[in-house]
Amino acid sequence: MTTVYYDQDVKTDALQGKKIAVVGYGSQGHAHAQNLKDNGYDVVIGIRPGRSFDKAKEDGFDVFPVAEAVKQADVIMVLLPDEIQGDVYKNEIEPNLEKHNALAFAHGFNIHFGVIQPPADVDVFLVAPKGPGHLVRRTFVEGSAVPSLFGIQQDASGQARNIALSYAKGIGATRAGVIETTFKEETETDLFGEQAVLCGGVSKLIQSGFETLVEAGYQPELAYFEVLHEMKLIVDLMYEGGMENVRYSISNTAEFGDYVSGPRVITPDVKENMKAVLTDIQNGNFSNRFIEDNKNGFKEFYKLREEQHGHQIEKVGRELREMMPFIKSKSIEK
């Protein structure tokens, strides 16, 4: 049964008197650090020199190289990209950990797949907001929050659960509610959602729809509007009220087409393919492929990225967005 924790459920402030090092100052890093600081906690930033280092200083934080930040901290939250966490941990974090430190993550990838293997005498926990950093920060300032997940991998001190819940409350997450999970469950469901639906599934669905219309002789501009541009309208309705809200809001023609044609596109074979994707996540095939490609300079990754950048739908989209000044352009030029 799903367990959800709110402000009133966090009885003990296990962060009181502890120093927190937030490693990284990107999307999640700036939000966690600022929310914790606003709640009165002692926060330092660990990061390499660069724009984020300078930005953290401008925001009023004490900023140190990662190793120095870890040395002085009791709780270390690692908020770096998955592909660099392993090296940073090995070279800068692990040598400076002390007994009963707490090592924390917002995504379980490197712990679950064994890239990072903490010593047995430190706590390891997860606090994962289900939204981007800018939303975590904005909702906090507004007095609300983004729902989050939390989980415990190691409880060396006997206080890991209290520390994790206190951390979740510290970033404001318990205002909305935090759901208890495990590193395994968070990692595998997150990767599956990205690959089968949110990123991989949706992008290929849109591309295939665009190609079908263009190959049938329709103008690429109209195809773009029908299968990509208008997606936002549907997703916004879905975000606010689920599929029922979509079907309530669209025309009867569109709703009828949903029922009779959706199953022709997403056939039982698609679900079987989704199961295969999930299996590759569960058995480590995907993580091994990603990790090995990273070691080889991301040759496969960059090749695939370049192929997608050149798709006709991207060229048409860039041109059409120039006609819509109400859209804040986020075109990625190379």
UniProtKB/Swiss-Prot annotation:
Residues 1-181 form the KARI N-terminal Rossmann domain. Its EC number is 1.1.1.86. The keyword Glycosyltransferase does not apply. GO terms for biological process: isoleucine biosynthetic process; L-valine biosynthetic process. Mg(2+) 2 binds at residues 190, 226, 230. Keywords: Amino-acid biosynthesis, Branched-chain amino acid biosynthesis, Magnesium, Metal-binding, NADP, Oxidoreductase. Binds 2 magnesium ions per subunit. Mg(2+) 1 binds at residues 190, 194. Its cofactor is Mg(2+). The active site is at residue 107. One of its GO terms (cellular component) is cytosol. NADP(+) binds at residues 25-28, 48, 52, 82-85, 133. Substrate binds at residue 251. Pathway: Amino-acid biosynthesis; L-isoleucine biosynthesis; L-isoleucine from 2-oxobutanoate: step 2/4; Amino-acid biosynthesis; L-valine biosynthesis; L-valine from pyruvate: step 2/4. It is an enzyme of class 1 (oxidoreductase). The keyword NADP applies. Pfam families: KARI_C, KARI_N. Involved in the biosynthesis of branched-chain amino acids (BCAA). Catalyzes an alkyl-migration followed by a ketol-acid reduction of (S)-2-acetolactate (S2AL) to yield (R)-2,3-dihydroxy-isovalerate. In the isomerase reaction, S2AL is rearranged via a Mg-dependent methyl migration to produce 3-hydroxy-3-methyl-2-ketobutyrate (HMKB). In the reductase reaction, this 2-ketoacid undergoes a metal-dependent reduction by NADPH to yield (R)-2,3-dihydroxy-isovalerate. HAMAP family: IlvC. Belongs to the ketol-acid reductoisomerase family. This is Ketol-acid reductoisomerase (NADP(+)). The lineage of its organism: Bacteria, Bacillati, Bacillota, Bacilli, Bacillales.
